[in-house]
A protein has these predicted regions:
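Sec-dependent N-terminal signal peptides
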Residues: 3-20
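Extracytoplasmic
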Residues: 25-29, 65-70
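A mature extracytoplasmic/lumenal domain signature
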Residues: 36, 49, 65, 74-76, ...
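Surface-exposed short loop/turn segments
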Residues: 56-60, 69-135
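N-terminal amphipathic/basic membrane-interacting segments and domains
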Residues: 61, 66-67, 144
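C-terminal/domain-edge helix-coil "capping" segments
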Residues: 101-183
Length: 183
């Protein structure tokens, strides 16, 4: 009799446990491209931005299947030859085109063609311009990541958390129903 009870409980709770496993927290993948004449200057910017993005905890810096693309055009300004006067960073925020809806509307035999022809399309989302002294380069880079996080990542993170919370409420109510039926 106990074995039957355990089997019934397993059958009842297994789908709920499986549902709970799909509740992954928010994470995103960001590609970073920096364009600058000076390799040392470019390297510093890549290092500062990458480090700051990774410190967010839910961001992976990668070129493979990014959710976001940050393109930074960096310039150094000089006074009379070699003396650095300032830095200018133009940041463009891009998002790869989400072709899922389009592919759902296309005839099956054309899906591969449509998928290939839309790969690599990026949607322009935002642009910022930061200007400062060379000694403030790190704080300028931190500001870029803070702006990117607050304007683009944070809303997605909050949306994902709301989805998780509502799924947990649904699982909780299903469990309560099952427990009440047992009583």
């Amino acid at each position: 009799m106990r074995i039957k009870t355990y089997i019934i409980l397993f059958i009842m709770f297994f789908p709920i446990v499986c549902l709970a496993q799909d509740l992954k927290p928010y994470s995103c993948r960001v590609s970073l491209y920096v364009s600058a004449k000076n390799d040392s200057f470019k390297g510093k910017i890549e290092s500062y931005i990458s480090r700051e993005l990774r410190s967010l905890g839910d961001v992976t810096v990668t070129d493979d299947k990014p959710d976001w693309v940050l393109y930074i055009l960096a310039l150094e300004t000089y006074i009379k030859g070699e003396q650095k006067a300032g830095v200018i960073l133009s940041t463009t925020v891009l998002k790869p085109f989400n072709k899922k809806l389009l592919l759902n509307m296309v005839n099956e035999k054309f899906k591969e063609v449509v998928s290939k022809s839309t790969s690599g399309i990026l949607e322009h989302r935002d642009n910022w311009l930061q200007i400062g002294s060379p000694s403030n380069l790190r704080s300028i880079c931190n500001e870029i990541v803070a702006d990117f996080d607050s304007q683009w990542i944070k809303p997605e993170r909050e949306h994902r958390q709301k989805e998780i919370d509502s799924q947990f409420k649904e699982i909780d109510s299903q469990l309560k129903e099952l427990i009440n039926k047992k009583k």
